[in-house]
Amino acid sequence: MTNVVVVGSQWGDEGKGKIVDWLSERADIVVRFQGGHNAGHTLVIDGVSYKLSLLPSGVVRSGKLAVIGNGVVIDPHALIAEIDRLAAQGVTVTPQNLRIADNATLILSLHRELDGIREDAASNSGTKIGTTRRGIGPAYEDKVGRRAIRVMDLADLDTLPAKVDRLLTHHNALRRGLGEAEISHRAIMDELSSVAARVLPFMDTIWLLLDRERRKGARILFEGAQGTLLDIDHGTYPFVTSSNTVAGQAAAGSGMGPGSLGYILGITKAYTTRVGEGPFPTELDDEVGRFLGERGHEFGTVTGRKRRCGWFDAALVRQSVAANGITGIALTKLDVLDGLDELKICVGYTLDGQQIDHLPASQAQQALAKPVYITLEGWKESTVGARSWAELPAQAIKYVRQVEELIGAPVALLSTSPERDDTILVTDPFED
């Protein structure tokens, strides 16, 4: 028995929600360890769709403990809204099935405003990142700048005013420079006071809770958000998110040691998608790209933005395997490729007349890198709903084997539809 870390191996939207839900049935605790409510996923359980952005997937399953770790930035308004939305669907979230790190950073209205102001200014200058405008980046900036308001501060009203003063000294200076009106101390205090009673009952010392449960033999599932290629260090900077999304962050973002992580499962889409700005070497602007987008329903859960689509990039996923220490992958959306005459896989790039096996970190070089493809025969048969290798066409199996060889990691699970049971299990990560 081992713990399992789930990470996206591409630019997010790999289908982590379904896989995490599938694994959460085997877990006792599900932990979010980074990001905020800027990346969502949809779970389909007994025909009912649940859209989650901040809450861990385990919250919709009875008998599971959902945990939001210290590495997450929490918008209390979004948290409360998500809890209320689930309640309307018959899912009750209480302190018995949700615990939140006392040292997690809060996203406030001023963070959301600053995010939007910057994106608008960047749009005018042609330098926008394509954020979700939800305040994630500014909140992480305050965390690193040691001026953030944290969950525990809601319980200490005596020291809160001084912390708000420190926060506003920074933010009002920024706002003056941007030509925006200053924010009053009272406005922030009122905002915090309005959410304290709803948030504080969930507060806990998470590192202690997880260490205690680990020692008792609990199975812990760490649920990553976004994807490796959006990591603040290892992604396509500056078109990245504001946190580390790689597996190592599961330790830092929860308070557990790296030795507690166990099996690293990389969720990997059978083709490639990206939302927003940034390099995308295998992007397809043709009929095939449109086919993938329509067949794969490639629209963001949180923003509704249309995703850019392209061929599978084995060179990028190979980097993700290395950066995360991926043990095995869950290959998703294989069924979307049904019916294509041929399939291409990127195995490297050409840059300045030379062939290279990885995407450079330089933004200028990324723009110049051209994909090198191999071509495989497609298949006409349907793979939708397949639950065993015997149900897959020979060419589909060949495609899967080629992916394994090129990325240097085996397929542990294979997903053939959005339904959780339409999954071919090769290796149970909890039993590896």
Swiss-Prot record:
Gene3D superfamilies registered for this protein in UniProt: Adenylosuccinate Synthetase, subunit A, domain 1 (3.40.440.10), Adenylosuccinate Synthetase, subunit A, domain 2 (1.10.300.10), Adenylosuccinate Synthetase, subunit A, domain 3 (3.90.170.10)
Keywords: Cytoplasm, GTP-binding, Ligase, Magnesium, Metal-binding, Nucleotide-binding, Purine biosynthesis
Residue sites binding GTP per the record: 12-18, 40-42, 307, 333-335, 415-417
EC number of this enzyme: 6.3.4.4
PROSITE patterns to which the protein is assigned, alphabetical: ADENYLOSUCCIN_SYN_1 (PS01266), ADENYLOSUCCIN_SYN_2 (PS00513)
Residues reported to bind Mg(2+): 13, 40
CDD domains for this protein: AdSS (cd03108)
Catalytic residue positions: 13, 41
Biological role: Plays an important role in the de novo pathway of purine nucleotide biosynthesis. Catalyzes the first committed step in the biosynthesis of AMP from IMP.
Assembly behavior: Homodimer.
Record's protein name: Adenylosuccinate synthetase
Organism: Sinorhizobium medicae (strain WSM419) (Ensifer medicae)
